[in-house]
Regions:
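N-terminal alpha-helical scaffold/docking segments in eukaryotic complex subunits
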Residues: 2-58, 142
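Pan-zinc metallopeptidase signature
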Residues: 2-25, 29, 180-307
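Active-site recognition of the HExxH zinc-binding catalytic motif
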Residues: 123-139
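Auxiliary, metal-adjacent structural segments of Zn-dependent hydrolase domains
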Residues: 36-103, 114-118
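A structural motif
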Residues: 121-128, 161-166
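Post-HExxH zinc-binding segment in Zn-dependent metallohydrolases
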Residues: 144-179
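Low-complexity, Gly/Pro
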Residues: 3-12, 58, 82-97, 163, ...
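Short pre-active-site segment immediately N-terminal to the catalytic Zn-binding motif
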Residues: 106-125, 143-146
Length: 307
């Protein structure tokens, strides 16, 4: 079920489009769950994102055949070889919906607006096919909101969610005799949170998808996400932490006091610090004995730390 933003700066459900990073804890939990479920090697199978040419949907292509073609692109990308998607269109609140049956045939419904505006068909289908992928994995979060955030996060981190961010745009529209700006958005993450997950993906795979964005607003949100993700790499006890963070960390270590993102424990083997891996957010525990290089047991990211 993909959220659909109505014209006029409205988000799914009729509220204003939310900005910033209000769901960051859930996004990080989703990344951890994804790595735990499919492993670091499984994530590496998605090193290449869905290319824009594969989901281009020209106006002269048959509506239903084109939708089936784009759905097959997503099925192939998410490695669901035996899944068959049947795509239809109707008026509804959300951008899309999928019936999560036993398979192998799945029925996807898309909002009727995609009949005439085909730019975001790939984005909506990416989200719905990811629902099928997660259903087959048996991976879900309790509650609709958190489960949709999991779906958006997985779609984005595994290479198709840049389409969801690119669906965020502001355009001039004529209403009656007035010219006004209308905003469109897909998904449950904020634009900046989509950018954050894309930044995490870029760091993991060395991929730069910014040239693929058609939307200037999506590009700005991606850059905001890059900046926020960069902060994760400058948190103590990581070696790249700034002077202020290092100074506070040293003070907290002496007092064995919890700090922003880290905590200490003292035992027979000495003091150890626990903090989140900036890639998968699995907790890492290291001895407090100066500069060292650590490897996350879950995602295999190597980190320089000064504990």
């Amino acid at each position: 079920m993909a959220g659909y933003a109505e014209p006029g700066a409205q988000a799914a459900g009729g509220g204003a489009i939310v900005h910033g990073f209000p769901h960051l804890d859930t996004v990080r939990a989703a990344l951890t769950a994804l790595y735990r479920r499919i492993s670091a090697d499984g994530v590496q199978r998605f090193a290449a994102s869905v290319h824009p040419e594969l989901v281009d949907f020209p106006a002269d292509e048959d509506l239903y055949l084109g939708a089936q073609r784009v759905a097959r692109v997503m099925v192939q990308h998410f490695r669901l070889p035996d899944a068959r998607m049947v795509v239809g269109f109707r008026d509804m609140v959300h951008a899309g919906n999928v019936e999560l049956a036993a398979g192998p045939e799945y029925f996807i419904e898309l909002h009727s607006r995609f009949r005439s505006d085909r730019r975001d068909v790939g984005a909506a289908l990416a989200h719905e096919v990811m629902h099928v992928y997660l259903h087959r994995l048996g991976l879900e979060f309790p509650g609709t909101r958190d489960n949709e955030i999991l779906t958006d996060t997985a779609t984005t981190y595994l290479g198709a969610g840049w389409l969801l961010l690119d669906a965020y745009r502001e355009e001039a529209a004529i209403r009656g005799e007035r010219l006004m700006m209308s905003a469109y958005k897909l998904g449950y993450l904020t634009p900046e949170e989509f950018g954050y997950v894309l930044a995490k993906r870029a760091a993991a795979f060395g991929e730069d998808i910014e040239p693929w964005f058609h939307s200037a607003q999506a590009r700005d949100a991606y850059r905001a996400g890059l900046a926020r993700a960069g902060q994760d790499l400058r948190q103590a006890p990581l070696a790249a932490a700034g002077w202020g963070a290092r100074r506070r960390y040293a003070k907290d270590r002496r007092a064995l006091a919890d700090g922003p993102g880290y905590s200490f424990e003292s035992g027979a083997s000495g003091v150890r610090v626990s903090f989140a891996c900036p890639t998968c957010f699995q907790r890492i525990r290291l001895p407090c004995r100066g500069r060292l290089r650590a490897r996350c047991a879950l995602c295999h990211t190597e980190l320089d730390a000064d504990t």
